[in-house]
């Protein structure tokens, strides 16, 4: 399960207004994160049926839940499977523990479940609330990679970790994006590992948190993809939305750190429907619909579809932290669509 997020505040100037109202989803670029932190959620088999009936072709789960993995058998749904932060130390310290984890949670299902990525840790930094896990991320990634390779799955399943915008020391303008000094020694070896193994970097990208952290300088239309014209001119790059700016700042940081060939997969992005500033059903609907439409075309810095996972499938009434954390769902626990988004 994704932990409570502390998002960096990104200062950007904004202009304009336009609303995009219709959407179709690129089946190869959109997934939805499935969190289970609620006491009123459907069964795993019901959830898989809901994905299939809505044409959602990819899923992220935050731990190797056996009911979910079993329900995924034969579904053709592609999967990001997380190694929870609490498991990092054991998998980093003992290669046999990593091999057992991979055998039990991946190999045993791999003939019928379409694993795409293993996310070894979520939003871990050497500073902040998850700092105690930082030293274990790369060793755990290496041990999981070794186990995946031993199973002959290295071409099918890529090992990565899920980061977020807090790794950036500078993010504006996007071309000046760079990793903060206290993060560089942590992230640079991870970048080298990803490059060596042909794996993407997973990144949770949230314009919502950037906007709510600095509403004096960031306008809502820029965060919602509804600005009518160029908001940020960054050399030859023109930005009409904050999502692109955040993602390209991370790409710029990767380039400066020797990871210019790495792909970024957006492993989470969403907007809450209640519980905080600008958290309304209308804003969330606008964000999700426009995001789905937008990621088919790339960013100013990187062309091509952006593989993206929406956060999240359901409202989760047992999430901790900010009240907004409970209200990111695309569906209610009763399996009703909150936004009437077409997935076909």
Swiss-Prot record:
Signal sequence, start to end: 1-27
One example GO MF annotation: glucan endo-1,3-beta-D-glucosidase activity
Reaction catalysed by this enzyme: Hydrolysis of (1->3)-beta-D-glucosidic linkages in (1->3)-beta-D-glucans
GO biological process: carbohydrate metabolic process; defense response
One family name in Pfam for this protein: Glyco_hydro_17
EC number assigned by the record: 3.2.1.39
Keyword terms, alphabetized: Glycosidase, Hydrolase, Pathogenesis-related protein, Plant defense, Signal
Gene3D superfamilies attached to this UniProt entry: Glycosidases
Root EC class: hydrolase
Residues at the active site: 123 (proton donor), 268 (nucleophile)
Superkingdom of the organism of origin: Eukaryota
Similarity section: Belongs to the glycosyl hydrolase 17 family.
Record's function text: Implicated in the defense of plants against pathogens.
Name by which UniProt lists this protein: Glucan endo-1,3-beta-glucosidase
Lineage: Eukaryota, Viridiplantae, Streptophyta, Embryophyta, Tracheophyta
């Amino acid at each position: 399960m994704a932990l409570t997020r502390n998002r960096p505040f990104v200062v950007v100037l904004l202009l304009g207004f336009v609303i995009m109202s219709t959407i179709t989803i690129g089946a190869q670029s959109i997934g939805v994160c499935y969190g289970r932190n609620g006491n009123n959620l459907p069964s795993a088999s019901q959830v898989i049926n809901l994905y299939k009936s809505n044409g959602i072709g990819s899923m992220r789960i935050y731990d190797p839940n056996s009911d979910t993995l079993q329900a995924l058998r034969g579904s053709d749904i592609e999967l990001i499977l997380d190694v929870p932060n609490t498991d990092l130390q054991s998998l980093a310290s003992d290669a046999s523990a990593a091999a057992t984890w991979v055998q039990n949670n991946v190999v045993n299902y791999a003939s019928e479940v379409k694993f795409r990525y293993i996310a070894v840790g979520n939003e871990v930094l050497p500073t902040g609330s998850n700092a105690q896990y930082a030293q274990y991320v790369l060793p755990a990634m290496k041990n999981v990679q070794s186990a995946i390779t031993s199973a002959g799955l290295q071409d099918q399943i890529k090992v990565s970790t899920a980061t977020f915008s807090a790794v950036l020391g500078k993010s504006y303008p996007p071309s000046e994006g760079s990793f903060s000094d206290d993060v560089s020694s942590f992230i640079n070896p991870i970048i080298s590992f990803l490059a060596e193994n042909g794996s993407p970097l997973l990144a949770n990208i949230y314009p919502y948190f950037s906007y709510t952290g600095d509403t004096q300088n960031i306008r809502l239309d820029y965060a919602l993809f509804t600005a009518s014209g160029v908001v940020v001119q960054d050399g030859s790059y023109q930005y009409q939305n904050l999502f692109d700016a955040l993602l390209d700042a991370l790409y710029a940081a990767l380039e400066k750190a020797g990871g210019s060939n790495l792909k970024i997969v957006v492993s989470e992005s969403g907007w809450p429907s209640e519980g905080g500033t600008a958290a309304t059903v209308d804003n969330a609907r606008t964000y999700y619909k426009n995001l789905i439409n937008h990621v088919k075309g790339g960013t100013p810095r990187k062309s091509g579809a952006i593989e993206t996972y929406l956060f999240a499938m359901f409202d989760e009434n047992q999430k901790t932290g900010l009240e907004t954390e409970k209200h990111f769902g695309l569906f209610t626990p009763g399996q009703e669509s909150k936004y009437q988004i077409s997935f076909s």
